[in-house]
Amino acid sequence: KDNNLIKDYKASAAEAMKKDDGNFFTKYGNFFLKGIQNTILISIVGVLLGTVFGAGIALLKLSKIKLLSWLASAYIEFLRGTPLLVQVFLVYFGTTAVLGLNISALICGMIALVINCSAYIAEIIRAGINAVDSGQTEAARSLGLTYGQTMKSVILPQAIKNILPALGNEFVTVIKESSIVSVIGVSEIMFNAQVVQGASFDPFTPLIVAAILYFILTFTLSRVMYYFEGRMKVSD
């Protein structure tokens, strides 16, 4: 299925090459637009779901139950200690070749990014929770709040505020790292740049366009994060 998709992309790019208007962006602009859409989609899914799973893993690591804490630590250390490229291949070939599931390359790429993000975000959240004064936990417990209520009403709201800049940086990192999923045929920016390279016989221009697009996405996101950081400081 994915191989057919790749052939379709290459056929479309070759067809675009036959256009005689001589304008690179008129010929291949749609490929880069499609790449931008998928890059943004993959990154958003990776960060959002990674945050959800990462929060759970962070709480497990902070658990007083040693087995749960050890398992969470092992999960985090393994994913942080192995390349994302290897993780992408493990998910892709593990789901398709080993388990025999018919899952698209796009979904496999998303799963790999979510798993990878969850490990890094778990550490961010854990650090944010530990940064909250322990006296607040003791005060909340003395008022009769349970551990769960203390986390929900006292600790996490402060921790989230503390970790927002780090989460923004993780989002920027994921946008750049999403290029790795091109190796399994996901049509994000880098994959489509390679398709255009093959169709146009121009090895340089598509890479320059891809680099500019990644820069625009990451720079825009960074500016947005700086804006919200400034608003948060004013509110304090």
Each language-model region and where it sits:
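Transmembrane alpha-helices and adjacent helix-loop boundaries
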Residues: D2-D236
